[in-house]
A protein has these predicted regions:
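Active-site glycine-rich loop that binds ribose-phosphate moieties when present
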Residues: 123-132, 154-178
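Flexible loop/hinge segments that line or gate small-molecule binding clefts
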Residues: 116-145, 150-154
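Contiguous, glycine/small-aliphatic-enriched amphipathic segments in soluble metabolic enzymes
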Residues: 1-120, 164-249, 253-254, 259
Length: 263
């Protein structure tokens, strides 16, 4: 995470857009900076977020002790510090000391603890802030893609999908497009689960029995959702250009196309 954060904040243009506050260890950050041979970058060390310098990258120390680092290897202390950083950022978010949180990558294995028993950030934030209806949404300049089932093994996706769950995710996506992206009447494309959208039941019946009924019900509520579309043909024909957002059934299928379109 530190490598990504440091290299990102080296871009001085970002400091003109927002005041950056990193929650972590200044000593660990310094170690990474030296290991990367980055000499033209330093964090402004502050005790609290409200002391942040508006024109410099700031860091709030959540741990000031010496830490033995072995770059590229997972350690328990790394997971502990990642959780401490996340908790400190959430606390400041609640207190309105900061306006938003951007999460850097975590090791989802070494962060597991009594305070974090989640498959990812999305589920942690949902529990932390009491959100029953939430959605993982990946956004690029050209596409917005939401995910119904999020972080879970592919083997569990089929049994997790329900008409009610898909309806909830479509509704959350519709609300987000209107509120966060100021789109008055958003158009949402819903992707199929099975190849060729099930091929009339030959390759699976989730499209006919679960996904299509969910789309029809939200459409009756004036939500402009369409589908289900086979993912390969949908993206291959660039049909995503005709919609404001896309809802995929599972994580990797959605993220795969987001990455392709971003590159």
């Amino acid at each position: 995470s530190y490598e990504i954060i440091i290299k990102t904040l080296q871009d001085q243009r970002l400091q003109e857009l927002f005041t950056s506050v990193v929650y972590g260890s200044s000593k660990v950050a310094s170690y990474h900076r030296k290991a990367l041979n980055i000499n033209d970058f330093n964090f402004n060390l502050v005790k609290k977020a409200d002391q942040a310098h508006p024109r410099r990258p700031n860091i709030v120390n959540i741990h000031d002790e010496e830490i033995k680092l072995d770059l590229g290897k997972s350690t328990s202390i790394a997971g502990e510090l990642a959780l401490l950083s996340l908790e400190a950022a959430c606390e400041d978010l609640v207190k309105k000391n900061i306006d938003a949180v951007v999460t850097a990558p975590i090791n989802k294995n070494n962060i597991q603890s009594p305070g974090f028993s989640f498959p990812g950030h999305t589920e942690y934030f949902a529990r932390k802030f009491g959100a029953d209806n939430y959605l993982m949404l990946m956004v690029t300049h050209s596409v917005r893609i939401g995910v119904v089932t999020g972080h879970m093994p592919l083997s569990k996706v089929k049994d997790t999908l329900t008409e009610e769950l898909i309806i909830k995710k479509i509704e959350v996506l519709d609300q987000s497009l209107k509120r966060d992206f100021a789109i008055h009447k958003p158009r949402i494309a819903v992707l199929a689960l099975n190849p060729h959208a099930g091929d009339e039941g030959l390759l699976g019946d989730e499209e006919k029995n679960i996904i299509r009924p969910a789309i029809e019900k939200v459409f009756e509520r004036n939500i402009l959702a369409f589908g289900p579309y086979p993912a390969d043909g949908f993206f291959g024909a660039a049909n995503y250009r005709h919609f404001d957002a896309i809802l995929g059934m599972y994580h990797d299928r959605s993220e795969e196309h987001t990455s392709e379109l971003q590159s």
